[in-house]
Amino acid sequence: MNRRLLLVDDEVEFSDIIERIAKKLDFEVCKTTHPSEFQRQYDTCNPTHIVLDMIMPEMDGIELMEWLAQRGCTAKIIVISGYNAQYGNTAKSAAASNGLNVVATLSKPFSVSAVRSILSL
């Protein structure tokens, strides 16, 4: 099965790191810095995994997760945030109540090994 990652993070340096790790793990990667572009890419990419930053301009991660839930998303979701780690846990609970599969939360800055381990789930 081909693994496809759809990644949205407005901080390019973090998304570049995740993209490099994912490609080394043989993921096909679709990447954007804007939530609206994430929404446009969702059907085309057909992700098996999603990395979703919680705090972005234009739309936050909670709004994107609600959008994903409305579409019946079955991808494994990894929530990342540069803010309080509790924010990621709150987002994980909210996502689960909407039927989404959040497999992990990551706080920025994160280690390469943590990303590698989580993408291997």
Feature names for model-found ranges:
Residues 86-87, 107-119:
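C-terminal output helix
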Residues 43-45, 68-74, 97:
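Conserved phosphotransfer cores of two-component systems
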Residues 9, 53:
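Active-site residues of response regulator receiver
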Residues 31-49:
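Acidic, metal-coordinating helix/loop segments flanking the phosphotransfer/catalytic sites
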Residues 33-34, 60-66:
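Acidic catalytic/metal-coordinating carboxylates
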Residues 63, 83-104:
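Alpha4 helix (beta4-alpha4-beta5 surface) of REC/receiver domains from two-component response regulators
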Residues 56:
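Receiver (REC) domain active-site loop signature in two-component systems and cognate sites
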Residues 12-30:
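Two-component/phosphorelay signaling modules centered on CheY-like receiver
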